[in-house]
Amino acid sequence: MLREMARFTIDIQMRFRDIDGMGHVNNAVYLSYCELARTQFYLKHNFKRSLHEIDFILAHVDIDYVSVAEWGDRVQVAVWPSKVGNTSFILSYEITEKKNGRHIA
């Protein structure tokens, strides 16, 4: 089932609290954006009827920051299964600026 799933993209509603003292989205906030995309991905593909029924362990996370997101940017997060094994799978993410497609992370 997971192997056939295509890229899933959501728009992120940036919040004022996401912005740090330097005027851009704080590095830790990107994980929250990915979490939101991941849960919507699971619900869209009916992994279970509710999030409480999804059994998985998040074992590893890494992010390559490419450019900054600033207040007013329209951010999108794409998620897709990039590797599927017998007992585990890897989800990949791409965070972009919606208006111009600029790669953020």
Residue ranges and their predicted role:
Residues 2-60:
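Hot-dog-fold acyl-thioester-processing enzymes
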Residues 2-10, 60, 65, 69-74, ...:
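HotDog/MaoC-like acyl-thioester-processing domains
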